[in-house]
Amino acid sequence: MSTKAERLMSDVRAPSPLQSSAKTSARIGWIDVARGIGIILVVAGHAAGGIIDGPGGQSTPWLRYAFLALYTFHMPVFFFLAGLFVVERLERGTAAFVKAILITIVYPYFLWSIIQFSLIYASGSLVNHPVETYWATIIALPWRTVSQFWFLHALFLVHLLGLAAWRTGGRAAVLAAAVAVKLVAMFVPSTPALSLAAGNAPYYALGLAIGWQRASTVFDTMSDRLRIGTGLCALLAIILLCSEADQLQNMLRVETASSSGIARIAWMPAMLPATLLGGATLLIIASALAQSGGRISQLLERIGKLSMPIFLMHILFIAGTRIFATHIFHVAGASLLPLLVAVGVGGPLLVKAATDRIGASKSLGLR
């Protein structure tokens, strides 16, 4: 296993002493597998969202409910994973921690927000949501996010929250601060960027409080009955809450809402049981696959290590493929989903391999 592999989706990497240990690398392989599963779900979610918002999107109610179920848990998992190694990194000093998140979060956030938004602006009516203003959006990037890059913006903010709270009172202070900001965001109107960061802060804090070692021990020693039971409970919770989603939100209906509207339903407080159980099930599956050591596990682990390039570029590949298929071949709807997911994962990996060969990955924020 490469000691320079991209260990976490954003800026989170295991400390170098841990990376040099084969035993430790084996123990944390499930984290990369979880990240691999998670980034595939992210790509699938955005591919489904593009179909929902595109021509004929209202004719696929099953896809809408699948999108709703997916959005209840897949991003909270990434915030949890992002917190697992934070304490070790904080112990190396504030300056090193801040420098790392500036390089691995802030720089890619601005660079790829500008690249992607510029292409969207240039595409005009070919995209699902054309934009008319350019510079106003670019100038506002420090406080108003575009597309999927809200995750990097939110992760940067929760890292700052974690840094401040941890220096004050350790893990308990981080948990308390995260719960506090989430409660405030629930009752005090704020900007979308701040609300997204506050809403996901507890998952990050939970990962930070548990740490990768405790998490690995829990999943390594979990009984088969508990694994299966958690999965069944997650399935029941997601089915129940998704079936009642229209009653949870007066202004939106799953079968008519846009993808962003469905996402707002998925992120409602009432969906918390589905969020926790769905996320736990994903992690349990990742742990079981990592322990099996099969080809699927190895593939997912590799994808997990390269999840940052996939995250940064998948929308460009998905949108480009969908536009090409719709306008050239007149193919639209859910039948495009497998192709979009394959291109959304595979395209960025090809770009990453090419930039590695020419030594451009670092300057593009891909490593």
Model-derived regions: residue spans:
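Alpha-helical transmembrane segments and their immediate juxtamembrane cytosolic regions
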Residues: 2-367
